């Protein structure tokens, strides 16, 4: 294991500080390290493996398509893209979809759409379009996505970033109201902030944001890359708020844990600003990606993993709420997306949980984030709870 870590560290760029653990196999909820030790994976690649690791249905779809046709350019039609587009548009109740690869790439595309819509439809002078984002967000690390962040540490050394972006506190409707100007084209938010610490908005906040958008002719963009596709116990986390955004951004679990697939979805009145040449993607919507994503969506539906997430997530949250320890500040979550916020450094607790076979990670230093595959069962949840009880007792 040490030689693998040393080799990787020697050749890798230094933009990650990984746990000193080498994973070599995954199946369902579990992963194994190179020493053969088994873990319950409560990271899931940060909600990539919602369907579980190496789901046989998705693997089968991947291998069958890979042996037939993997890539063609979007200057041609493929035989499976249209059916996938119909499936995902019906799921999101949107007219159009733009298939892409990574989550941050989809955010970049949504920014472009919002800007073009702002100038062409709302009539904002080109170059003066503004987008409002939320403090403590995470939309990605490419320049456009990074421009939406308020984390100076993430942005240091990468200026100048996009102009016309501003951030306000997540959950503060008065601050958001004050930030809106005639040049505001879009408000982008995560319905539940993920990397920010599983932050759930105050009751009625998202509905109030929707009302502001309607009043001021502003697009509401929901970044559901991490929280969508069953993670919170709904197909889309916006469903918890009974709010329909103008634009959905999806990713992560859209590729079933096997392939990078992302998408931007909107209705005709928004998506029509994209015309030939205004956007493109070499790999977006390729036949292999589409075969995998189709199977990934089918597994979520056929195995009722969205409903399972709500049911078992509620069970897990209720059990964790019984934990008593002076270090625990708050435990919160929806579905199988749970944050345990401490009033101290979470890293030692994470280390102890990993030693007990629970693979997890801290975020923002004090929060333990749990997002196991949605195929988890009650016995595995009991093991997670037992590990937490043991760690906090000792």
Curated annotation (Swiss-Prot):
Pfam families: Aminotran_3. Its EC number is 2.6.1.13. It comes from the Bacteria. GO terms for biological process: arginine metabolic process; L-proline biosynthetic process. Its cofactor is pyridoxal 5'-phosphate. Belongs to the class-III pyridoxal-phosphate-dependent aminotransferase family. OAT subfamily. It catalyses: a 2-oxocarboxylate + L-ornithine = L-glutamate 5-semialdehyde + an L-alpha-amino acid. This is Ornithine aminotransferase 1. The keyword Transport does not apply. The keyword Cytoplasm applies. Pathway: Amino-acid biosynthesis; L-proline biosynthesis; L-glutamate 5-semialdehyde from L-ornithine: step 1/1. The lineage of its organism: Bacteria, Bacillati, Bacillota, Bacilli, Bacillales. One of its GO terms (cellular component) is cytoplasm.
């Amino acid at each position: 294991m040490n030689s693998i870590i040393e080799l990787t560290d020697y050749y890798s760029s230094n933009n990650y500080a990984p746990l000193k653990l080498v994973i070599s196999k995954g199946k369902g909820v579990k992963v194994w390290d190179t020493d053969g030790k088994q873990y319950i994976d409560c990271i899931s690649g940060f909600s990539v493996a919602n369907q579980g690791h190496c789901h046989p249905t998705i693997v089968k779809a991947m291998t069958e398509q890979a042996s037939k046709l993997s890539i063609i350019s979007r200057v041609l039609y493929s035989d499976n893209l249209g059916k996938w587009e119909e499936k995902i548009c019906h799921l999101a109740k949107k007219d159009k979809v733009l298939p892409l690869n990574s989550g941050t790439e989809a955010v970049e595309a949504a920014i472009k759409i919002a800007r073009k819509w702002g100038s062409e439809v709302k009539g904002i002078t080109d170059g003066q379009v503004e987008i409002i984002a939320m403090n403590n967000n995470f939309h990605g690390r490419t320049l456009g996505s990074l421009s939406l962040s308020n984390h100076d540490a993430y942005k240091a050394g990468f200026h100048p970033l996009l102009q016309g972006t501003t951030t306000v506190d997540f959950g503060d409707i008065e601050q958001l109201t004050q930030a809106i100007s005639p040049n505001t084209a879009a408000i982008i938010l995560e319905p539940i902030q993920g990397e920010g610490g599983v932050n759930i908005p105050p009751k009625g906040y998202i509905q109030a944001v929707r009302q502001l958008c309607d009043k001021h002719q502003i697009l509401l963009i929901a970044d559901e890359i991490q929280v969508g596709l069953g993670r919170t116990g709904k197909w889309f986390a916006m469903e918890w708020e009974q709010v329909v955004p103008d634009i959905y951004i999806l990713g992560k679990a859209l590729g079933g844990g096997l392939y990078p697939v992302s998408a931007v979805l909107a209705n005709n009145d928004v998506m029509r600003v994209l015309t030939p040449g205004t956007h493109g993607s070499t790999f977006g919507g390729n036949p292999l990606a589409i075969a995998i994503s189709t199977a990934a969506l089918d597994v979520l539906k056929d195995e009722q993993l969205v409903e399972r997430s709500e049911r078992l997530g509620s069970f897990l949250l209720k059990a964790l709420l019984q934990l008593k320890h002076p270090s625990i500040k708050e435990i919160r979550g929806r579905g199988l997306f749970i944050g345990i916020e401490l009033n101290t450094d979470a890293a030692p607790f994470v280390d102890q949980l990993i030693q007990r076979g629970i693979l997890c990670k801290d975020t923002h230093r004090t929060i333990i984030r749990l997002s196991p595959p949605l195929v988890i069962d009650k016995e595995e949840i009991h093991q997670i709870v037992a590990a937490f009880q043991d760690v906090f007792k000792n």
